[in-house]
Amino acid sequence: MDVSRTTPTVPRHSRNALAAPAPRPTRTAESPPAAVLAQRFLAVRSATLALCAPLSPEDCAAQSMPDASPVKWHLAHGTWFFEHFALAAHARRHAPFDPAFDYLWNSYYEAVGPRHARPSRGLLTRPSLARVLEYRAHVDAQVLDLLDAPVVPDALAATLALGLAHEEQHQELIVTDVKHLLAANPLQPAYHARTPAAGAPAVPLRLVPRGGGLVAIGAEDHDEFCFDAEQPLHRAWLEPHALASR
C-alpha cells in the first residue's frame, strides 16, 4: 500500500512524522505540552500506516472471518474515534468529513448510534482505501491544528491519550487479522518477504529457573496512562517456575 502521500501537511508545525470500545482512563494527569502530545499523536498514527505499508489495497479490504476486520476498517475506525470524540467536542466549526462515516466506522459505541454489522465489514468495498486514507489525513491535520496551542485542555488531552491507546490496540488487531487472512491464502503469501538468513546451529534450549514470591500486578493511579481494567495495583503469590531460554 502506498502511504507516501498520507502523512498530513499542517500549517504552523514542524513535524517528524478488540474492536470493542476501550475503557475510559481512570484519571487525568496534568496536561503535557502541546508539542509533546503532537509528537506522540504523529508517532502512533504513523506506526499504524507503517504496519499497512506491505499490504495491497486488496489485502486491506478483505475480511477472513466474522471475528476479524479488514485493515481498511481498522484505519477508518481509529480515525473516526478522533473525529467523533476529539474534533466534534473541541474543534470550532467542525463539520464531519462524511456524515455516513458514523454508521460505517462505529464499532460498539451504543450511545453514538447504529452501526454496520461486524461480520459484514468485508462487504464495504466503498468507500475505497484511497478515500479512507484521505479521511485519515484530513482528521490528523485537524487534530494537529487543535494542538497548535501552548496549552492543551485537560479534557482534550485525556481524550487523545485514550484515543492513542485505542489506536495501539487496533495496531495489534491489524497484525493478528492480517496473519489470519494471509494464512487462509493457498499461495501462502508473506506479510514481509525476507531473504533467508544463513543457516546456523540453534542455541541449545535450556530452562532458566526463577524464584517465586509475592509480586505486584496492575497499575497505580498516578501520571502514567492505564485502563480501568488494569487497576488496582495488587499483590499476588507467584510460585517458583522456569522459563525457556528461547
PLM regions with names:
Residues 2, 8-60:
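N-terminal regions that are enriched for targeting/export leaders
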Residues 3-5, 12, 97-98, 104:
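Contiguous N-terminal and early-domain "leader" segments and peripheral loops that mark the onset or edge
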Residues 36-40, 47-52, 59, 69-73, ...:
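Extended beta-strand/loop cores of jelly-roll/beta-sandwich
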